[in-house]
Amino acid sequence: MKKDPQELIDSVRQSSEFSNEEKSKLIDSLRKKKHYGLVWEEKPEEVEENQRNWIPVLKEVKERAIVSEAVDAPNHILIEGDNLDALVALTYTHEGKIDVIYIDPPYNTGNKDFIYNDKFVDAEDSFRHSKWLSFISRRLKIAKRLLSDKGVIFISIDDNEQAQLKLLCDEILGERNFVSQIIWRKKTGALDAKGISTTTEYILTYCKSDYLIDKAFSKDSGAYDEKRFKYQDEYYESRGPFYFDTLDRGGLRYSDSLNYPILLPNGKQLYPHGRETFVNDGWTWKWGKEKVEWGLKHGFIDIQKSSKNPSGYSIRYKVYMNVDNEGNTINRTAPHKNLINDILNADAAAVIKNIFGDNVFKYSKPLDLIRRLISFVNNPNATILDFFAGSGTTLHATMALNDEDGGRRQCILVTNNENRICEDVTYVRNKKVIEGYVNAKGETVNGLTANSLRYYRTNFVGRDKTAQNRRALAAASADLLCIREGTYSELTVFGTLKLKPSVARYFEGNGKHILLILNENAIEYLVKEIEYMDSPDKFKVYVFSPGDYAYDDEFADVADRVELCAVPSSIYNACEKVLPARTHDGFFEEDDETSADGWFDEDQAESGNDSDSTIYNKEE
């Protein structure tokens, strides 16, 4: 029989077989042991093991940039690489900034849909579920950090891992933050049914903070029939259109106080159910006497001649679109339902074939499904992340929804390049959507040109905090900073100075001015330029430093015009929160050098010092 954890702790305390130090360690271990929930055997993952020695960064593939001429075009991002590496890099650029995450992870069906350590996991693998849970768990923990306070995450899944995923999400994202398990009917039937035809999948939905659920989600404007509101009166501007409803009703909820007469224009009285006298036949008015008097006075009640009633009259009340029956302004919507049954999976294949002329990707989700989910979130300027991007449906849906409702949502996609999917499918699909294309019928489809797209690959810098690695990480930080600040236009001149990329780089855009200083010898000259530059905005200055010191003293004369940040320490600080522990002792020991004096050798600064020992691209 299993012992209660507290019983085991008491047994350890009373035992004479252990020293006090051993007892302390055992008790601590027992207290940390999970008593309820999901338990599985952690399986090592090669990409995580690689991160014990290397920090992931992002490097732009500039020739693939698609830059819109529209001034306010959102900048979308496509990252080619393992999503665990990309998530670590995004911890620096987007921690607490992602409003919507949608992911469609492998379902672990055992039919070659899930790869772990470069091998397919089949149905006979005894660690099949443990590998999948280890894989998803690592990514969800980082994803939670990326969510904003009002952030929402949608996760598609089927019966193979739904039960395990729900428990895992309760543990990582918080059971109290569970919103709904949306049921999606993806097809009308299944020929391969095992006794019962499975036609549905699930979309687990969680929010970052349960107390902000009401603010995070939009309402369903289609929850009422707009066509019913077909009449107008003199109150149209303030109340909107209306329809009529009967004022009387019959049923079990009878009350004498609601069975009273209403005076008609001909001087007679009318009771509920068209009666001219008081009778308890179960019928009453829906409104009390005082409210009816108020309704008659303010145009909410309509008395019309009617041949159907013995009195010759009928009494109806008006249901307005924009106010309730007491005159209060309302938004006639309702929460979205957790059932989606009007979008089929077959729609996804049709969209892919329409763009490419062939079904080049078999596992994409329907465009309208993702657009529907994004629209559930009450933020037309949301930043959206999909780190199992596949064919890139989430970006396509984001751009389509922006075009529909005028939003400025930005989307970040992450996918590996297995079978060249990132280059040949994800990128090409969305390039066509932006620039326009000819569909399978030979018709021209106009592009959604008010969108920019930038393409990045994951690169790596050594994790040891050597002088060489620090410099390499600072040099590699430029693309991360552009993403972090949403500023992509690089200028080669700063004031009157012509900049060397190995010394300093300057970016403008999105109402921001970003200066990256890689050689502290240039600070004196750059400070003088800032003094004389005519700019109402502050300069965000990222400056290379061996530690956390951002040269505040050197910038003292322009302190009110700059915001300083030391690199690469700010990158180390962000990434260390999610990176696995190092494999050797002495990890992250500081170098002997503690000041910036002589930190840069002039020759090294000009070369950029991008040696193979400190920075590499995993694809090479």
Which residues does each predicted region cover?
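DnaQ-like (DEDDh/DEDDy) 3′-5′ exonuclease domain used for proofreading
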Residues: 1-102, 108-132, 138, 300, ...
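Signature of N6-adenine DNA methyltransferases within the class I
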Residues: 136, 149-150, 159-223
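PRPP-dependent phosphoribosyltransferase catalytic core
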Residues: 400, 404-620
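SAM-dependent methyltransferase catalytic-core segment centered on the flexible catalytic loop
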Residues: 66-69, 81-84, 88-152, 160, ...
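Conserved S-adenosyl-L-methionine
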Residues: 125-129, 133, 150, 160-164, ...
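Glycine-rich adenosyl-nucleotide cofactor-binding module
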Residues: 67-89, 344, 348-381, 400
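Active-site-adjacent helix-turn-beta-strand microarchitecture at beta-sheet edges
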Residues: 18, 23, 209-356, 372
